[in-house]
């Protein structure tokens, strides 16, 4: 049941790209990031008030800058420059980059299965993103790599906090601080290039409002809130299984909202990437179940 619940935030996150293109196509990424982060953070804070200790503000500001301000802007750049399916499937390569980061920084070599599945995922991604078979915006691809880097560095920084700061406090305040940074950046940017901001405000439509509500309430407030709640009740491995809903949502929402279509070979490559990203967790789970059954039989 928890795995099914874990699919809910993953599904909403996967719809970000198509919903943004469909409802907010001409909006500046800085403005979108600010609107997504700050209201959601304030909602979560109102739901469960918390205040960080004085010594924790510095790390929360860094988290807000990396996890929220930079990451959200890059996500919206991807949403506005890449097909939804490509964005959703591309982001499942995070474990491969995390594996390489851990290997290079902490000298922790990956397991054989992790290495094989990672190599296969890279090969499939190389074929999917081959410019000879599909035309992709290089700005969007650079934003994807940047977003993946934010996840890895931000997760490493968050993990270093240990038990010092409650998860809810970290979540609420990194959204608020990241949203504040984005708001300031958007104000400065609007002074330099006011036309895009003026157009977004003057031409505000019900479609825009629905898109903003989806991104703020479902993608962020509900998605991140449920994410934190579930992590307290299930293992990270189990939660990873729910993550399959992310690329699937990207593919389906891109098809329904934007009319995106790909060749059978490209869809096969997407399915292969999803399978390779899940393979190590599936095998580890099966091994754990087998060990538990063996231990129970012995006792």
Named regions from a protein language model:
Residues 44, 110-130, 244, 253, ...:
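Hydrophobic transmembrane alpha-helices of multi-pass small-molecule transport proteins
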Residues 12, 16-17, 45-91, 125-127, ...:
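Specific transmembrane alpha-helical segments of multi-pass solute transporters/efflux pumps
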Residues 11-14, 18, 38, 45, ...:
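Hydrophobic/small/kink-forming positions within alpha-helical transmembrane segments
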Residues 23, 32, 36, 77-78, ...:
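Hydrophobic/aromatic residues within transmembrane alpha-helices
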Residues 1-3, 25-30, 34, 53-58, ...:
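Juxtamembrane helix-entry segments on the extracytoplasmic side of multipass membrane proteins
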Residues 33-35, 72, 87-93, 157-180, ...:
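Helix-helix packing/entry segments at the starts of transmembrane helices
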Residues 18, 40-44, 98-99, 136-194, ...:
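Transmembrane alpha-helical segments that form core, pore/gating elements
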Residues 31-42, 76-109, 113-115, 147, ...:
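Specific alpha-helical transmembrane segments that line the substrate/conduction pathway
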């Amino acid at each position: 049941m928890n795995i099914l619940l874990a699919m809910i935030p993953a599904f909403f996150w996967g719809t970000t790209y198509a919903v943004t293109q469909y409802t907010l196509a001409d909006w500046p990424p800085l403005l979108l990031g600010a609107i997504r982060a700050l209201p959601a953070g304030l909602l979560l804070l109102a739901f469960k008030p918390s205040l960080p200790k004085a010594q924790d503000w510095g790390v929360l500001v860094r988290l807000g800058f990396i996890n929220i301000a930079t990451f959200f802007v890059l996500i919206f750049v991807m949403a506005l420059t890449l097909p939804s399916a490509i964005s959703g499937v591309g982001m499942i390569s995070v474990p491969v980059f995390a594996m390489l980061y851990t290997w290079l920084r902490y000298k922790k070599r990956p397991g054989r299965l992790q290495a094989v599945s990672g190599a296969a995922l890279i090969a499939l991604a190389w074929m999917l993103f081959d410019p000879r078979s599909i035309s992709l915006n290089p700005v969007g691809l650079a934003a994807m790599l940047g977003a993946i880097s934010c996840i890895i560095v931000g997760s490493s920084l968050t993990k270093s906090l240990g038990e010092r700061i409650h998860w809810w406090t970290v979540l609420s305040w990194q959204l608020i601080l990241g949203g504040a940074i984005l708001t300031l950046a958007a104000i400065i940017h609007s002074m330099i290039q006011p036309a895009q901001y003026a157009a977004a405000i003057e031409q505000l439509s019900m479609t825009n409002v629905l898109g903003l509500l989806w991104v703020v309430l479902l993608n962020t407030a509900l998605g991140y809130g449920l994410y934190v709640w579930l992590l307290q009740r299930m293992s990270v491995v189990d939660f990873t299984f729910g993550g399959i809903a992310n690329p699937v949502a990207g593919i389906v929402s891109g098809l329904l909202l934007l009319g995106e279509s790909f060749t059978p070979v490209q869809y096969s490559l997407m399915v292969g990437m999803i399978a390779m990203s899940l393979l190590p967790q599936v095998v580890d789970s099966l091994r754990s179940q087998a060990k538990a059954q063996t231990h129970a039989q012995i006792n």
